[in-house]
Amino acid sequence: MQKPLVCVTLRGRTVEEMCNDAPKAVKLGADIVEVRLDLLWTSVEKMTSSGTDEGGNESIEVIVNHLELDAIDVEDSITTISSSIEAPILITCRPQSQGGHYPGSEEDRVSVLEAAIASNPSWVDLEIDIESSKREDLVKLAGKGTRVIASLHSLEATPSISEITQDVMDAQDMGDMVKACYHTKGRKDALRIFESALKLKSSDANYSLMGLGPGGDWSRIHAPALGQGLVFATTESGWHLSQQGKINASDLRIAWEVLEYS
């Protein structure tokens, strides 16, 4: 059974933090590392609230602040990232409309993606809803040297199995890999994603399906059996990841060994 590629999304909100996380990601089993350029325009504040959690510990509230567009030197950041990280890189610059943090206009974001592609990354993430002519130009710019992930992210409820599979089939000619991520509110939502991936296994689509929320990690853990081509993981660890639908890269590799997906 062929195992999917493992892509680890780098932690950090500065170029230095992301570059420092890359070797750890590779050590944990990453085939590819994802650089979320949109996170460069954010900073985090951690504030202690008056309440406590279930374990009696002080509750910590995390506040994400957005920086001004001109706070980041895009060209310099991309140059440093591409020269400092040895692993294959997936470049992403997610708009706020799809759960990302890029603060500028869509025209500005496309310019960031153009600069990113010019650095010759192994992969680039291009959302399927980018204006068609602009997206075609980006795909042409990527050429044969940079593979394209055609992505879609739903912040609403998880759709039906037929809708999920149709999403993937409709997008399969828009890139080398289709990434579809859905917000899960419970196990039933996660099961629909799981069943959709299983249904797609008999197709010729190259896909990566996942959920963000309870049960979202099912399609990641069982990705080899579901015919998935790529799985996203993290260097972060902790029990909270399961509720977020995420999984640590090392834990993912161990799970595949235990389940004999090799």
Regions found by a protein language model. Name each.
Residues 2-19, 95-107, 151-162:
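Active-site mouth loops of central-metabolism enzymes
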Residues 11, 34-40, 65-70, 117-134, ...:
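Catalytic beta/alpha-barrel core
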